Amino acid sequence: MATVNVNRSVTDIFYRYKMPRLQAKVEGKGNGIKTVLVNMAEVARAIGRPATYPTKYFGCELGAQTLFDHKNERFVVNGSHDVNKLQDLLDGFIRKFVLCPECDNPETNLTVSAKNQTISQSCKACGFHGLLKVNHKVNTFIVKNPPSLNPAAQGSSLTEGKRSRKQKQKNDNADGSMTNNSLANNSGGESDGGNGTNQASQTEAEISAAIPEKTAKDDDDEGWSVDVSKEAIRARLQDLTDGAKGMTISDDYDKTEKERIDIFYELVKDKRDKKQLDDVQTHKELVIEAERLDIINKAPLVLAELLFTENIIKDVQKNRPLLLRFTLNNPKAQRYLIGGVEQTVELHKGILMSKVAGIFKLFYDLDILDEAVILEWAQKVSKRHVSKNIAAEIHEKAMPFVLWLKNAEEESSESEEEEDDESEEDNYVSSAGQRGGQRVVQRGIPRAVAGDEDDEDDVNIDDI
């Protein structure tokens, strides 16, 4: 089997850390098509990670569901995927979750703290130990399925481990009771009277001695339980810095995009109802939440739905600072904002359809939408956000402003060309004058003086 370096940035053929080249096979057709990772188990053993981790990483990166069958060592990613692309994704996983950040060696272990919901990485080669700095959707999966967990339980839940511990405890209790019964039978053959009572009291005494009494200290420890309600979590997030908020691990990563958009929708709606959207701190909080939910580009679509009414002109002017936080230097977010504007126009068609050109000009004048984004949008009628008829009508109403933009662009380009031509002519004239001056200097005398010398030469000839 062909092998490659675990760290593929190392080209040394004698590099000691090798792994099998990933093999994939596409099975099925239509909606049931899937990519089977044939040798994922061998690859996982070579890099020292459970096979579920890179498989889940593929699913997060490709937006596909994953299936695990530990008994048959079968790992599947839904959809048809090229093996070379999967190998590149595997390199990304190794870079983020396997290689040591200090020495780049793959001799590392991951340790999960279920209490703190953190992942630590330790290196056997250089001794490095620290928190994993990578913030990825697969982090949540790793926290729920730590490396120390039985591989067959990974991908399901921790309940199996708890269930096995309870079963073991039950078996131990059963063994203990059987031992006590045998002791009672052995000693109980002599007498059935007071001896039985003494044996029962003796057994109770042994059980009481085995179970430690509760102390005040134990009661104090029980009072330190963590409140995991939504209000408590939101309060703790408020105490974090902006950078730490983006690094927190949340179960929201496992939710679909629609569910994450709904979470952001409810947050914006709550801030709007409480009239907090004028606060700069609220703007920062919304941006951080959108980044955490990985919907920063689609957030303007939510803002348009909640903030724009039939008085969209005033709404845009009022909420310009908030809109700029999402659309500034972000063409994708601007395109989704245009989609939100289209939906608003469709909702208030009788009032806003005739004002479309002015609405787009307002967005342009306030620097919320860039010229290039508007011109790109105008090239094609799309029914992504509204019906095709409404989209075509909006494009038609916006055409005067689009033509104005195009003409302004052409005029600016023509004026720039004219300025360039004039500057070239000026440079040519000045250079010609300089060249003429140089010729006079080279002759060493002004033109009039040269004429006088010619006259003097004529006189001298006549005299001769």
Curated annotation (Swiss-Prot):
Residues 174-184 have a biased composition (Polar residues). One of its GO terms (biological process) is translational initiation. The modification Phosphoserine is found at residues 9, 412-413, 415. Residues 145-203, 409-464 are annotated as: Disordered. This is Eukaryotic translation initiation factor 5. It comes from the Eukaryota. Belongs to the eIF-2-beta/eIF-5 family. SMART domains: eIF2B_5, eIF5C. The gene is eIF5. Pfam families: eIF-5_eIF-2B, W2. The keyword rRNA processing does not apply. Catalyzes the hydrolysis of GTP bound to the 40S ribosomal initiation complex (40S.mRNA.Met-tRNA[F].eIF-2.GTP) with the subsequent joining of a 60S ribosomal subunit resulting in the release of eIF-2 and the guanine nucleotide. The subsequent joining of a 60S ribosomal subunit results in the formation of a functional 80S initiation complex (80S.mRNA.Met-tRNA[F]). One of its GO terms (cellular component) is cytosol. InterPro entries: ARM-type_fold (IPR016024), IF2/IF5 (IPR045196), Transl_init_fac_IF2/IF5_dom (IPR002735), Transl_init_fac_IF2/IF5_N (IPR016189), Transl_init_fac_IF2/IF5_Zn-bd (IPR016190), W2_domain (IPR003307).
